[in-house]
Amino acid sequence: MYPGITVIKRDGRREPLDISKIRKYTKAACEGLDGVDYSELELDAKLQFRDGITTEEIQDTLIKTAVDKIDIDKPNWNFVAARLFLYDLYHRVTGYTGYNHLREYFERGERAGRILPGLKEKYDLDDLNSYIKPERDLQFTYLGIKTLYDRYIIKDKENNPIELPQQLFMGVAMFLAQNETNPNSIPNEDKDKVDLNNPKSIRGYWAKKFYDVISKFEVMVATPTLSNARTTRHQLSSCYVGSMNDNIEGIFDDYKEMALLSKFGGGIGWDFSKIRALGSFIDNHKNAAGGVIPWLKITNDIAIAVDQLGTRKGAIAVYIEPWHMDILDFLDLKKNSGEERRRAHDLFPALWIPDLFMKRVEEDGLWTLFDPYETGDLTNLYGEEFEKKYIEYENREDITKRKVKAKELWKKILLEYYETGNPFLCFKDNANKRNQNDHSGIIRSSNLCTEIFQNTEPNHYKVKVTFEDGSEEYFNEDDDVKVSLGDVEVVVKGKKITSLHYINGKKVYIVEKVPFDGKTAVCNLASVNLSKVNTPEKIAEVVPIAIRMLDNVIDLNYYPVRKTKDTNLKNRAIGLGAMGEAQLLAERQIFWGSDEHLKLIDEIFEGISYWAIKTSAELAEEKGAYPEFEGSRWSKGILPIDTANEEAKKLVERDLFSAMQYDWKSLREKVKKGMRNGYLMAIAPTSSISILTGTTQTIEPVYKRKWYEENLSGLIPVVVPNLSADTYMFYTPAYELDQRILVKAAAIRQKWIDQGQSLNIFITTDKASGRYLNEIYMLGWKLGLKSFYYLRSQSPEVKEEVMDRSVECFGCQ
């Protein structure tokens, strides 16, 4: 006892400070961890005690004391702080140090209006409750559990937590497994463990499988899925990708679509390449159009006005092709100088670059800018067809054009990139040449984080004519329509019909334009933790579960806009990515960029690609192929590796397809019969979920060995995972690497990936030069990369810094 010091309990009672009660928790928090000592923690914390302190303050003091001790040579204080936080969380949710029954959790969540009613009735809750593994909470770092608490744990209206970590993971798993009722889905070796006549038993089998990979941190679903699966607002998708048509109906219909998607937390990537340029025609009047910038200004205001459920402003990336006449104004969008009415500081500009532009840069040639009003079909073409049409337009005298030096435009692009981090660079032809669904459209842009590459299509419009008798008829805008005006019969275009006209003797009442056939792509994401899943055996075990789980997201998702649901159900696109590559390398004592590194990731991503494709083909046998399968490259037995960049293939000396564990020949034949998913793999940024799972971010090297993260509690020191004398030198900070190594590693991964990678480049100001940047991005283009995300720069003098997360897409994390 400590005379004179009393503690105020949670219920308001006072009692003398009893250090033995505190010691019970400090001992448990330090148990089994090297380099930490409970007595040291108590000694430092005791000095801060005072009379009348609350139990919450004691807990906060202990946690803060442990957090302050986190350092490169004492990383395990991270886990001490995490355990102390967990003990407090247990008490806040259950009133004791432990888990309550799953049924109690669901009932409380339903009463609070936060958990979807009816979900718990689909399962044997006693069975699932006994399967929960509370000991897996010990995996959390302090920042990991704090991130889970701040962003993902469900809370009631008074902001009190109502779930514990393993309940969260089980709730997500149950939500994603609720449609699994087919007894044929159970593998033969497990059929004796399941009552095949009981849907609850079948669902429970898959819920356990999903729970295991999530709760072991082998796979983590993206933020929207982790946040919203199990809740009444089950919007599970990360990002949306769309394209705008060049008419007033298309523009404002897209604004509404963007607003609704942003309202429910989705990141957005949108193609504006069709919008006519400044000074273009409107209704045959020259110099009437204001160009793309005023429309982007409105888009910027939408991002601010329609924030994401009041938590953060919307996030929208806007794409144009570099032949657009407004390209120079577009590059100035985020400048702090110049006319403010032509700035859009809250957007994320991105370029959709054709091969021809890069060739003109290489040969120091001229580049011709066009008005999309006159050359809009260029947005529908890529490769040789694009080049042929582009050169044809260059040679036509009747086309509005402007010539610039390609190299000068490229220099301006790279300068803006270095100064602002934008525009993101995406390569149109590299994307479309490897489009597994080129039979059903064209890829027009990427998403906010530049890893999603799927077909999109702007709305096409028909003229809907409603007659005074209530009947309706539809015409294309350019159809020739015979109409009468009084006694005079004339032929007008569909878009010129008015309410003064008669058609076939019927008086026109109203004329409207209605949208048809648009496509807005959807990103449903999860990431494999390479620090835990990196052997052929483990990949074969985990990847099939992840693919099945992601496929279920498509059917269980809430779609804010019908077009997104229609598109997603037609192509059934998912994006399985990866994180923890830097941790894997450090733990295996492999230097970043070494031949051993490049060979290892080649082998790992071959395995992930193989099992992702195989699982999707098997799901097609079980549940049916995606509706747009026929005519796809999949249907012809063409796999992503078959269209891989030839130069990228030379980066690793490996005999492709020689590994006995991957029977690619048989897989090709299986794939020809059906694929469940039109798109399969994409590597997203994973910022939040990598923090949560205590691994390194996505496929990148670490920024620092130690840095600070900022959250509601202040600055939290962070040390790279499993740091020791054995791993220290293998955690090479990103800014110390030759960035061409990052590009080569990305090219090796890209061989196996049907979509793309969110790839950042890291430059210190003393190494930055136009020549170096040109070499990096030219190399990426030549090696078949589809995109580059941020260009991050910092001074070489910076030793420890606060990580800036403000520029990251919350959804793709």
Please report, for each region that a protein language model flagged, where it lies by residue:
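Core structural elements
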Residues: 53, 68, 140-155, 214-227, ...
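A glycine-rich phosphate-binding loop feature that marks nucleotide/adenosyl-phosphate handling sites
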Residues: 44-45, 63-66, 81-87, 213, ...
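Core nucleic-acid recognition elements
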Residues: 1-3, 13, 36-175, 179-211
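A structural-propensity feature for long, helix-poor, extended segments
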Residues: 39-51, 55, 277-316, 512-522, ...
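Internal maturation/activation junctions in enzymes
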Residues: 213-216, 222-224, 543-565, 591-686, ...
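Catalytic alpha/beta core of large soluble enzyme barrels
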Residues: 119-129, 133-147, 453-454, 550, ...
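Long, structured ligand/cofactor-binding scaffold of large enzymes
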Residues: 92-97, 136-304
